[in-house]
């Protein structure tokens, strides 16, 4: 609903809340943005549909890049009390490879924390920094002034929250993003995934595990992987994820696939019982959305499809994009500035990652390259580094330079570039 000039306030406007910065969504991206904005002295209000703590479909993995962002937020001591993972164990096509996290630009360990705990802890950081919270409130629409700027966000209760600046972090489906004109383009790869929790005596292992040869109960090779992430609390996060496009939709029932994957690993891991708390998700990836910014609003995190197409990771991108969006709040207009920031930080990597992920949706590509790749420890070290988003602009080694060149070339030939 677009705002219009009126002679006086409506009853809804008379009872509306007003804030400088309104953040919609209290997950890692939204709470990160709120914390950094509040630290700069701004008046910040965060709203979220859920009451916290709340669960979220996720592998719970915190990459070294995510660990670095959490430490910047002041959560280093909290993380020190959580499990630390040395690297990634990959299995498939008749081989097993362990690759330590590569560094040196990021911490040497990763972690895994259930989202019920992680999201609440980051939200509390934002609250401790001065951000106000309004939980159990769903944003469904916006009001705009004559210049196209968002003047208020409308809740499902009818209440309007007036704001000068708006950061949208309401997740992959992004109800408010759609109201603002966000479009998801499914011609590039997206992900479908499901996870659960299961007890095991190996819950304190120092390696996360990915099975790259994911097969259906009928034996068909699927474009995806299964994972087991030790949580250090007596359980692991176990799940399966598959890649898809509009032309090649995922042809797998997720819950039966997770149960089958669990059965395959039961003896090896000593699983007790069946996976509990199963949750599935549909994930736009690699910046496959347009309409990520307007005059006074920005989409961040999953709402902006800031998800790695090669591994489905989104927490590190959410934390980073929250911080980066807060740094732009002093600008008058975000329409071009925010897409430019997203392009500078993520477009090269997303472009080439989308192209590689698309190849994985072709069974012949997997069967021909999988066995060769798994038998080369050097190649798998490179794969872990680029798949994990561990290449920075400051890195000058051969792998970093090659990855950046590949990203630039890929972006030039994109039919639709990331975030456009």
Q: Which positions does each model-derived feature cover?
A:
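C-terminal helical "tail/cap" subdomain of flavin- and related membrane-associated enzymes
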Residues: 327-420
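A conserved beta-strand/loop capping segment in the N-terminal third of enzymes
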Residues: 67, 71-121
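FAD/FMN-dependent oxidoreductases across multiple families
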Residues: 246-328, 338
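Glycine-rich FAD pyrophosphate-binding loop
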Residues: 38-58
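Beta1/beta-strand and adjacent pyrophosphate-binding region of the FAD-binding site
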Residues: 13-29
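A short, basic/flexible loop-to-alpha-helix module at the beginning of a structural domain
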Residues: 2-18, 302
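Conserved Rossmann-like nucleotide-cofactor binding loop
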Residues: 29, 52, 173
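Predominantly flavin-linked oxidoreductase catalytic cores and closely associated redox partners
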Residues: 125-269
